[in-house]
Structure formats: C-alpha cells, structure tokens
C-alpha cells in the first residue's frame, strides 16, 4: 500500500530498511489477518502496524514478529499507536497465536505486557540491542523452550513478472 509506505518513511526514515527486523520481513507477507492501518476522517493513513510469522530457532515454535508500529509524526500522542497495539494483540490472540516478539523501546511496550524476560535465549538475525528484544506470551509458557535465532516463516511475496521489451 503506497500510503502505508509513505507513512513509514515519514515516521521512521530510510534507515528502517537496514534493521534486523526488516531481514525477517523482506520478501514475506504479513501474517494472515494481521495488517492494520488507522485512518483519519478523510481516509488518510495515520498509523500502521503489521505482524509477521517467524519461527524461534531451528525447528522451534512459531510466533509473530510485530512491526513496525508507526504513527504520523504530526499527530503523535493522540493514542493511535496504543489503539493499534491493543487491536493487534487482541486479533493475534483471537487467531490462536501463542506469542508476539518485537524490537523496541521497553518503556513504551511494557504497558501492553511486553518484556525482555522471556527473550534471553533468543536472538535476531543481525545486529540489534539485546535489551530491546521484547516478548509477550499470549499463551502461558509459549516461550519456555524457545531458543535460537528468529527465522522468517509464512507466506512469501509473489515475484512480479515484468514484460520484456523487444
């Protein structure tokens, strides 16, 4: 969605493409039913969050990777991010997912139940700040045996076939 990409660029800048989380999202579709946008009264995209299927370690349990969460910088602190987070977590639970992970600021995400407590045996595929790898169990004990590096899973994007010029 071009409007979502424009919002992500405004909110996060071009460096977002270099993050470890992006490696897990690249070439994949969000988890089924877990891509959300907030719109204003005129239909403009004001916020977005998506969740992506991942596997925790080699042959480990399935989980979701949340992100990026972005809100139009001109209307931050209006509760849009919080509303998107609550909705995303509720939908993930309703769809039967067991855990959500993210890389983010603990002081913000703790209000939704995320912490680094359950991520000590997990790693991202690339550089990241360990204290920012946070998790929320939707099913108690879902991360008890989780170990290793997060790996991309889920639906792949279909390659677009471009017509060849003669």
Where in this protein do the model-derived segments appear?
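Short amphipathic alpha-helix that is part of the acyltransferase structural core
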Residues: 1-23, 29-30, 35-45, 59, ...
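Conserved acetyl-CoA-binding loop-helix of GNAT-fold acetyltransferases
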Residues: 66, 71, 77-90, 101-102
């Amino acid at each position: 969605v071009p409007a979502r990409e424009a919002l992500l660029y405004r909110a996060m800048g071009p460096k977002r493409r270099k993050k470890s989380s992006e490696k897990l999202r690249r070439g994949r579709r969000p988890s089924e039913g877990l891509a959300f946008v907030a719109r204003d009264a005129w239909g403009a995209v004001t916020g977005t969050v998506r969740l992506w299927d991942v596997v925790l370690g080699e042959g480990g349990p399935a989980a979701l990777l949340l992100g990026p969460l972005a809100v139009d910088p001109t209307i931050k602190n209006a509760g849009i991010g919080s509303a998107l987070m609550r909705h995303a977590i509720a939908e993930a639970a309703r769809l039967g997912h067991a855990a959500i992970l993210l890389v983010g600021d603990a002081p913000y995400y703790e209000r939704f139940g995320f912490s680094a407590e359950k991520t000590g045996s997990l790693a991202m595929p690339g550089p990241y700040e360990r204290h920012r790898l946070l998790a929320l169990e939707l099913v108690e004990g879902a991360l008890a045996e989780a170990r290793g590096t997060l790996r991309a899973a889920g639906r792949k994007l279909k390659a677009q076939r471009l017509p060849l010029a003669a």
